[in-house]
Amino acid sequence: SGSKTAKIGDGCFGVRIDRIGSTSGMGCGSVPKPTPGGS
């Protein structure tokens, strides 16, 4: 069960970065990389 949480955090960032790119930070919500957002 713990593994799922870790994968979700990493997958959310990787998957969103591939689809949205800079919106990945905002889409995930609490991702440790709000720099690519450009805000």
Curated annotation (Swiss-Prot):
Main location: secreted
Localization of this protein: Secreted
InterPro entries xrefs: Natr_peptide (IPR000663), Natr_peptide_CS (IPR030480), Natriuretic_peptide_brain (IPR002408)
Positions annotated as propeptide: 1-8
Function: Snake venom natriuretic peptide that targets both NPR1 and NPR2. Exhibits hypotensive and vasodepressor activities.
SMART domains, A to Z: NAT_PEP
Tissues of expression: Expressed by the venom gland.
Protein name: Natriuretic peptide AsNP-a
Annotated organism of origin: Austrelaps superbus (Lowland copperhead snake)
Disulphide linkage map: C12-C28
Gene Ontology MF, one: toxin activity
Annotated family: Belongs to the natriuretic peptide family.
GO-annotated cellular components: extracellular region
Annotated PROSITE patterns: NATRIURETIC_PEPTIDE
